[in-house]
Amino acid sequence: MTHPLVSIVIATKNEENNIENCLISITEQTYPNIEVIVVDNNSTDKTFEIALKFTDKVFNKGLERSTQRNYGMAKIACGKYVMFLDADMILGPKATEACVSMTENGNWIALHIPEFVLGTKYFTRVRRFERSFYNGTVIDGARFLKKSTFVEVGGFDETISGPEDWDIDKKIKQIGNIGLL
């Protein structure tokens, strides 16, 4: 079985308290062919230095996640597939393997990866409660997609700050099916 390359692009800004756990979760993936790209937004903490411990593909670019993600994809990523993560996300060990399998063997050009909110602080519990009412297709944008799909829809709209993932999700739905992991 071949294992097409998956490019994981992480947009960061002052994420020294989160980025290491995110990157550790990527190193623990059962899927064997992953490149990690971190695109930082001028962090004033140790985010950049921590990321360099895990990958040499760490760049300082962009003012918003849209710009950062587009830079990571258009200028750096070599994979057949791309996964977009935020620095405070942690992947289960089989997440990448499951995404590739579903996309290779199904009729999907992209996948929603539901987020599970962890932690015990008050607002974390509120967020977890709120998210319990939604499925992955309602509140999350597609996080795993074919690079060719990304190119076809023109990437992220760099004029949008905030709901850029919903915008690209809408564009992807116009050309194909999005599955749910």
Language model features: what each stretch is:
Residues M1-S25:
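N-proximal low-complexity "stem/linker" segments adjacent to membrane-targeting elements
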Residues N17-N21, D45-L52, K94:
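Acidic helix N-cap motif at the loop->helix transition within catalytic regions
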Residues I24-N33:
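Short, acidic, metal-binding catalytic loop of nucleotide-sugar glycosyltransferases
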Residues S25, D40-F48, M89:
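A conserved acidic beta->alpha catalytic loop
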Residues N60-A77, T137:
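Glycine-rich, basic loop-to-helix element that forms the pyrophosphate-binding segment
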Residues V82:
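Short aromatic/hydrophobic "clamp" motif used to bind/position activated sugar donors
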Residues I90-F123:
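Conserved donor NDP-sugar-binding/catalytic core segment of glycosyltransferases
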Residues S161-I168:
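Acidic donor-binding loop at a coil-to-helix junction in glycosyltransferase catalytic cores
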